[in-house]
Amino acid sequence: MTAALLQFPFPTPTLRELTLAPKWELGELTGRLTEISHGGLSAACWLVLDAQKNGEPCAWVTAVESTFFPPDLAKAGADLDALPVVAVKSAAEGARAASRLLRSGAFGLVVLDLGPCPGLVAALQGRLSALALKHDAALVLLTEKTPDAPSVGSMVSLRMQVKRQGFNVRLQALKDKRRGPGWALNEVVSGPAGLR
């Protein structure tokens, strides 16, 4: 007696397709300079949670007066005691602080909140990118730009835009030197207790 093969109404993805599918996790961003434009705090916080879950130390450098809301991050499961926050006065100081953190080799993820900074000089981008690659770390730049505004610089390997629609968050690749632009990821999030 022979066993019948099960037929699925859709093709089963191959192992190659499964491993090449983009994911929003630290392992996808290590060794890269990543920019998240326009409202990327949630996306950066997801990376902090992923890094901490995998035992990777993280640091957050902020050059703006408002940053993430610590109680929200703690409620999501982040260990705030293991997340050093460096407050600086300008984007240039923030980039130097990120450079020192990466050079130490102690951090798997460094988030640099640049705010409305128009860009970073090429030499600084090159140094940050090289340090991220050398120490197998991810450097995530948070900027406040529209999708049609230019990137922070040419060394940015991945540029993502965040779009919100109610409690749906869509991450869309505007630039990706590994996969090409255009791919997107969708995530459903819950709001604060008063909005649920």
Predicted regions, residues:
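Short glycine-/polar-rich loops that comprise or flank the Walker A/P-loop
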Residues: 55-56, 79-82, 107, 135-138, ...
